[in-house]
Amino acid sequence: MSVDDSADVVVVGAGPAGSAAAAWAARAGRDVLVIDTATFPRDKPCGDGLTPRAVAELHQLGLGKWLADHIRHRGLRMSGFGGEVEVDWPGPSFPSYGSAVARLELDDRIRKVAEDTGARMLLGAKAVAVHHDSSRRVVSLTLADGTEVGCRQLIVADGARSPLGRKLGRRWHRETVYGVAVRGYLSTAYSDDPWLTSHLELRSPDGAVLPGYGWIFPLGNGEVNIGVGALSTSRRPADLALRPLISYYTDLRRDEWGFTGQPRAVSSALLPMGGAVSGVAGSNWMLIGDAAACVNPLNGEGIDYGLETGRLAAELLDSRDLARLWPSLLADRYGRGFSVARRLALLLTFPRFLPTTGPITMRSTALMNIAVRVMSNLVTDDDRDWVARVWRGGGQLSRLVDRRPPFS
């Protein structure tokens, strides 16, 4: 087999996770090649919200000044079940603000950081096959046009469906809760509103309470990102027509937000969540971000996990036996939180759970403050307050009784 190009590190996927990994690897002096099927800038279905944890990662990448030119969000405005509450971003370990940037802009900006750091880009190219040596190390990739690309190490960041990950043995376990979502964009005079708005009482046109939420995330550019998402499992699939649902949700909020017309650029996504995949690493390769199901089961957020796992993967490139080290690192860092979050998210798929607990929770500001913190991945191992201790302890107990723990 002849090799047409090669790199020390090949990264497949130039979204936030892949570009972050490429940037950190290039900063360490490695020869990095990034391959992506798209040409940039390109859109991606997403809520576009950036939690304080994501903001912190962007600052580490050197994008703090760039982010300062975008909207700042104080926290979450949550409404439903007869109540509404505004909760500032909590937690001592992260910045006190979030933001929102359309993925069309965000992904290309992070990609340019990697490129400016020295990573080479091969865009508009699709990796379709992997080749191993006798010790099962990946030695090269085949692209759709027949080009062979050699590599010493491989980082796979090709998204929720992860076609290359599947070729490497990745398996998604759909009995664990997953998400379905749709989003679009609408113009409004309230695009500078400093709150990310979530409607927790999401109903279908016939009045049934759905296991999910609707959102309106101001972008500060004259538009908002509007969308709806729901939770599902193989046993209790969310039988939703997403595009009619976002249209219905838009009509419900039309007067309040001054919307005219229907959302543009409507796009949907399927989201493996909470580490509900196995086969995330081999001897010299790793899956990161959405490809490793690093998505929050309680809100569908994945950008902060993508940025973090990209950085962590780059830090492990000198290690041997990634097949053991990478799943262990993911489980240690995210396993407890993902386990208990999956369990809570599963409860939301039971029809009577939300109508029973929603009104009680919405009446308690203290409970909503706790909910925002844990739902937004703002608890760290260094936090010593009682909420952090209870969350970590609950996650540890939950993981002990998991039939299939995260990343296994």
Curated annotation (Swiss-Prot):
FAD binds at residues 13-17, 46-49, 103, 127, 290, 302-303. Its cofactor is FAD. Its EC number is 1.3.99.38. Transmembrane segments: none annotated. Pathway: Quinol/quinone metabolism; menaquinone biosynthesis. InterPro entries: FAD-bd (IPR002938), FAD/NAD-bd_sf (IPR036188), Geranylgeranyl_Rdtase_fam (IPR011777), Geranylgeranyl_reductase (IPR050407), MkRedMenJ (IPR054880). Pfam families: FAD_binding_3 (PF01494). Disruption phenotype: Cells lacking this gene show complete abolition of the synthesis of MK-9(II-H2) accompanied by accumulation of MK-9. They have similar growth rates than wild-type in both aerated and hypoxic culture conditions. However, despite having similar levels of adhesion and infection at the earliest time point, the survival of mutant bacilli in the macrophages is dramatically reduced. Keywords: FAD, Flavoprotein, Menaquinone biosynthesis, Oxidoreductase, Virulence. The keyword Phosphoprotein does not apply. Induction: Constitutively expressed at a low level, not induced by salicylate. GO terms for molecular function: FAD binding; oxidoreductase activity, acting on the CH-CH group of donors; oxidoreductase activity, acting on the CH-CH group of donors, NAD or NADP as acceptor. It is an enzyme of class 1 (oxidoreductase). GO terms for biological process: menaquinone biosynthetic process. The keyword Lyase does not apply. GO terms for cellular component: peptidoglycan-based cell wall. It catalyses: menaquinone-9 + AH2 = beta-dihydromenaquinone-9 + A. Belongs to the geranylgeranyl reductase family. PANTHER family: CONDITIONED MEDIUM FACTOR RECEPTOR 1 (PTHR42685:SF22), GERANYLGERANYL DIPHOSPHATE REDUCTASE (PTHR42685). Catalyzes the reduction of a single double bond in the isoprenoid tail of menaquinone (MK-9) in M.tuberculosis, likely the beta-isoprene unit, forming the predominant form of menaquinone found in mycobacteria, MK-9(II-H2). Is required for M.tuberculosis survival in host macrophages. This is Menaquinone reductase. The lineage of its organism: Bacteria, Bacillati, Actinomycetota, Actinomycetes, Mycobacteriales.
